[in-house]
């Protein structure tokens, strides 16, 4: 056995050595997945009248696959169509997601897909790191509020922020890279906060990708 095969090597990319057992996610006992449809195991349905419907099937979400693979507890703090603004203003409160009894050792935040269509992006300067009540009402401000409120609940939690992949949003494609850069800038403002850089490392969302990983016009659970 070569023990080096279990260690990160210089220059190794995040997709170069995939771990079927959940990898180092297993060091956490609890994880919360904050996000939209892409954190919710979404399925697009086309009914007999040609009308599209969208369904959250959390058991198919990548968070629950991590839970089963790594043997940890994962909470889906997510819903299709979610934005950072809605999460802060009503969704999390209505679902009890600010409840300290649901405090997690780690959180993933996968938001921006819908935000780029509905709100000013702003910048990381919209965040008052001393008091989230002073954050500006922009995507960046609400995004920062989410981190800060969960840090109040679990000060030692680790946060993993997901950027947006290229090619998934044709409506506001020009906002995808700026939104991803804001997410990177937000991560720099907080301790124990890291970036899962899908924009940099994810395979391109091209026609072949869509054929394999889409149901209609929406990513399927595998995608």
Task: Annotate the PLM regions.
Residues 155-156, 191:
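Proline-centered flexible-loop/turn and helix-kink motifs
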Residues 40-57, 78-86, 123-134, 216:
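Acidic/histidine-rich helix-loop elements
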Residues 37-40, 79-85, 113-118, 165-169, ...:
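Solvent-exposed loop/turn segments at secondary-structure junctions
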């Amino acid at each position: 056995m070569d023990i080096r095969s279990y260690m990160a090597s210089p220059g190794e990319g995040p997709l170069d050595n995939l771990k079927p057992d959940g990898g180092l996610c297993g060091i956490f006992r609890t994880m919360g997945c904050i996000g939209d449809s892409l954190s919710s195991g979404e399925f697009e349905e086309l009914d007999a009248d040609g009308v599209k419907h969208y369904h959250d099937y959390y058991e198919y979400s990548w968070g629950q696959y991590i839970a089963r693979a790594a043997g940890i507890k994962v909470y889906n703090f997510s819903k299709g169509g979610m934005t950072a603004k809605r999460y802060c203003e009503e969704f999390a409160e209505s679902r009890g997601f600010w409840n300290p009894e649901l405090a997690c050792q780690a959180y993933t935040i996968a938001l921006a897909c819908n935000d780029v269509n509905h709100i000013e992006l702003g910048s990381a300067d919209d965040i008052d790191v001393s008091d989230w009540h002073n954050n500006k009402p922009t995507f960046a401000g609400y995004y920062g509020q989410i981190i800060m409120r969960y840090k109040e609940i679990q000060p030692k939690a680790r946060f993993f922020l997901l950027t947006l992949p290229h090619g998934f949003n044709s409506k506001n494609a020009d906002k995808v890279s700026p939104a991803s850069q804001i997410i990177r800038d937000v991560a720099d403002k907080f301790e124990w906060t890291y970036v899962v850089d899908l924009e940099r490392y994810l395979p391109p969302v091209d026609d072949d990708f869509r054929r394999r990983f889409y149901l209609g016009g929406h990513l399927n659970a595998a995608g």
